[in-house]
Amino acid sequence: MLIRKKIFFFIASLSFPVTVVIAQTASSKQDKYVFSVAQDGTGDYKTIQQAFDAVPYRNKKPVTINIKNGIYKEKLLLDSTKDFVTLTGADKFNTILTYNDHTGKLSPKGDTINTRTSWSFKILADNFSASNITFQNDAGFSAGQAVAVESDGDRTRFTNCRFIGNQDVLFTNNEKSRQYYQQCYIEGTTDFIFGSATVWFEQCHIHSKKNSHVTAASTPPDKKWGYVFNDCILTGDTSLHNVSLGRPWRPYAAVVYIHCFIGEHIKPEGWSNWNNTDNYKTTRYAEYKNYGPSADPLKRVTWARQLSDEEVKEYNLQKFLSNFIPAKNKTP
């Protein structure tokens, strides 16, 4: 059994997608829980929420939930008492978690849904991780704010996942939260990455579907960092040429793009002030050695910065996320 445990933890630490099936034995229960979800009844549960509910109250042990392919139309909540959960899909294109709530829609209880209640999946737990899954809000292009994932917990990690929707797709909520997204695909229309958390995006593909804004950070003034995009690719639909890298949801929004490909959909000036010139004085927008058709630093707004070689050294992954990422540090 000792050998099998070592193999499991080695595989779980790899960054590329791996599907692992491990039998749940009496001895393994002492160290972790492994559940499976399958809509056809071949797993431990038919729905993901059932698997979440099976996680022990105030859990302190690793729980792995393996999800078989399927479209799981559920409004999912991972409670704050359900820490240390790992969600693993069989295939990121065919393991789809989706729902269709949006602002203005009535909930089953008769309440009017708003941005903060429109989520398809809300994570309140700490130490959550996911890989090989599509997270989606399929409310539609004209539905308004419709969150696919609201991530509130601390030390959350997504690897090789897809986030699909339109406006307000990925809500990185909670100013005390630290989050890491590695090799993920995120697409949307307006402010589709937004919130107050400290977040590092590593080698992600960010795709715009409308002439609007990629980010809407609300970084608190006392937080040194907000969003960092490192070695990412920014693309847009072919008809787009007026997308901004971000606009400040709050005055001290902090967003940095480092070594990123900036597609021609991004407007030359790069950034938006959200129609408030006072934001010139407080926003913390910067870039470093980006490349691509819309990466010319000479055309950027004067109130955004280009980092120096010395300044960029501060953007150290382990330092940025206070050492919760186990992988080797990569300094830009």
Where are these regions (language model features)?
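Bacterial Sec-dependent N-terminal signal peptides
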Residues: 1-30
